[in-house]
Amino acid sequence: MIKQRTLKNIIRATGVGLHSGEKVYLTLKPAPVNTGIVFCRADLDPVVQIPARAENVGDTTLSTTLVNGDVKVDTVEHLLSAMAGLGIDNAYVELSASEVPIMDGSAGPFVFLIQSAGLEEQDAPKKFIRILREVTVEEGGKRATFVPFEGFKVSFEIDFDHPVFRDRTQSASVDFSSTSFVKEVSRARTFGFMSDIEYLRKHNLALGGSVENAIVVDKDGVLNEDGLRYEDEFVKHKILDAIGDLYLLGNSLIGEFRGFKSGHALNNRLLRTLIEQKDAWEVVTFEDASTAPISYMRPVAAV
């Protein structure tokens, strides 16, 4: 049986919020079977919980924000991408502020944290959402699509009219049955344009952003001294974002996601459209792991 997974131990980290610039304390904790990923605002009394579900997404300006009434948690996508990539079904994410820390702008530090905590299999079958037919949403020349696929695959194309992008790969397709999320996707950092940063800061956004946690691009090129981690790091980060956004379905996917210039808003619209179309998907479990189209690495031992 492919079983659900949680963390073996509690683990903590500290960072800053990309948009708020505030110091944030993050604690990842094990959670019981069928809990899902639940964000907890531990700085509030009483603590407010927000399950990581598509219907709880509020704002999608520059990042994905979860809301419960007037309480929010910003920038959840990189941590959720790490949870998805390592197959974590159940966990509590405690935060001391309204934003997940940006760390280095990728999912890499979260992968390290989760691996350090260790993974534990639970005595319940892991649930997958299998895509049964194509579902597409489009808006303003952008497109996001689910298609049936026996495995999990993410294909993405970006289209930036800028010298830095023109010379680089702007499309990528990653089949996770043969490609490692940890090696090929998790370290891709978020990116931004120098020309946008002043505007964002005037609107109290990107206050914590720097070359320490993002690829910064100006008219001449990449400003980061160490350059890029992958030749196609820009489009790989869009794949990383999409994996995090897709995990708001609450289960791992069996299917392919195709994005063309898609972002957090359109990704969420695709999830909501899929959920409404009950004939487009089904929930499946696997009593025999050898019959599953997706193989997850064995639980990682605590370091």
Curated annotation (Swiss-Prot):
User: Which GO MF term does the entry hold, naming one?
Assistant: UDP-3-O-acyl-N-acetylglucosamine deacetylase activity
- Lineage, top-rank taxon, reads Bacteria
Q: What class of enzyme is it?
A: hydrolase
* Involved pathway(s): Glycolipid biosynthesis; lipid IV(A) biosynthesis; lipid IV(A) from (3R)-3-hydroxytetradecanoyl-[acyl-carrier-protein] and UDP-N-acetyl-alpha-D-glucosamine: step 2/6
**Which UniProt keywords are listed?**
Hydrolase, Lipid A biosynthesis, Lipid biosynthesis, Lipid metabolism, Metal-binding, Zinc
Record-annotated active site:
H264
| Documented EC number(s) | 3.5.1.108
Cysteines paired by S-S bonds? none
The UniProt entry, under Pfam families, shows: LpxC
Catalytic reaction equation(s): a UDP-3-O-[(3R)-3-hydroxyacyl]-N-acetyl-alpha-D-glucosamine + H2O = a UDP-3-O-[(3R)-3-hydroxyacyl]-alpha-D-glucosamine + acetate
Listed binding positions for Zn(2+) are H78, H237, D241
Provide the GO biological process annotations.
Answer: lipid A biosynthetic process
Names of required cofactors: Zn(2+)
Task: Look up the record and report any one GO term of the cellular component aspect.
Answer: membrane
Family designation: Belongs to the LpxC family.
Q: What does this protein do?
A: Catalyzes the hydrolysis of UDP-3-O-myristoyl-N-acetylglucosamine to form UDP-3-O-myristoylglucosamine and acetate, the committed step in lipid A biosynthesis.
Q: What is this protein called?
A: UDP-3-O-acyl-N-acetylglucosamine deacetylase
Q: Which organism is it from?
A: Pseudomonas savastanoi pv. phaseolicola (strain 1448A / Race 6) (Pseudomonas syringae pv. phaseolicola (strain 1448A / Race 6))
Q: Which gene encodes it?
A: lpxC
